[in-house]
């Protein structure tokens, strides 16, 4: 085995206060069972490295999107909702005045980052793979609706009451990878145009599993 890359998640760090961007070695504070299982799996990887000298690195990646994404995910769900004139529910704070925010990253950028790490890594290290800009989900929905030339019918809902353990804001620092020579190349708005066009041209990928 030359290298084992474990894909973890930004969620292991828990919610990020405004202005905070978690670095790779910051303390974990999982906000839900899914995040806890990912953090536990990271520790299992570390134990295999320490015990069996397995060559392991770990990545934290957040909110990957692209063609063929599952229709339940936010971006394809917005596309299908705008297309059909349906209401989209957007997770927000308790007052329903601020939408949750993320650093969305194109799947092609993630693949590029992985290839970069194959040639540029240090065994036992962790790496954040982060999108170029932070965007809240209402802004993202409005961008998609504008691309489609249709209105966005939406309702803000309290994120925790609708999905316990869901964090309003996730944020990672991409400075480590940047210092190594890697940065995402895809512009969010330009890539969204491509995803919208592809999804509308391949509507089977927007179809819910319950649909015939």
List each model region and its residues:
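Active-site loop of short-chain dehydrogenase/reductase
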Residues: 1-4, 16, 54-55, 87, ...
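Conserved Rossmann-fold NAD(P)-dependent oxidoreductase catalytic core, especially the SDR/UDP-sugar
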Residues: 1-32
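Flexible, glycine-rich beta-alpha linker
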Residues: 13-14, 29-33, 57-74
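Active-site Tyr-X1-5-Lys
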Residues: 15-17, 31-57, 82-83
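Short-chain dehydrogenase/reductase
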Residues: 30-42, 69-76, 103-104, 134
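Structural element of the ATP-grasp superfamily
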Residues: 45, 78, 177-178
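C-terminal substrate-binding subdomain of Rossmann-fold SDR/epimerase-dehydratase oxidoreductases
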Residues: 82-212
């Amino acid at each position: 085995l030359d290298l084992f890359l474990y894909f973890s998640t930004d969620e292991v760090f828990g919610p990020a206060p405004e202005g905070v961007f978690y670095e790779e070695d910051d303390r974990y504070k999982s906000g839900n069972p899914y995040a806890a299982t990912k953090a536990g799996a990271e520790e299992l990887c570390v134990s295999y490295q320490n015990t069996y000298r397995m060559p392991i690195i770990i990545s934290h990646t957040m909110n990957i999107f692209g063609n063929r994404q599952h229709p339940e995910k936010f971006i394809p769900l917005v596309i299908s909702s705008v297309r059909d004139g349906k209401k989209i529910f957007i997770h927000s704070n308790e007052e329903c005045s601020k939408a949750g925010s993320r650093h969305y990253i194109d799947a092609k950028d993630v693949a590029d980052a992985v290839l970069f790490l194959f040639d540029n890594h240090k065994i036992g290290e962790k790496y954040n793979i982060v999108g170029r800009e932070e965007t809240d989900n209402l802004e993202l929905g409005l961008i998609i609706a504008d691309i489609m030339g249709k209105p966005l019918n939406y309702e803000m809902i309290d994120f925790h009451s609708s999905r316990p353990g869901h964090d309003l804001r996730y944020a990672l620092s991409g400075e480590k990878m940047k210092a190594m020579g890697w940065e995402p190349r895809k512009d969010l708005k330009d890539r969204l145009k491509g995803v919208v066009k592809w999804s509308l041209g391949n509507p089977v990928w927007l179809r819910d599993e319950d649909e015939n």
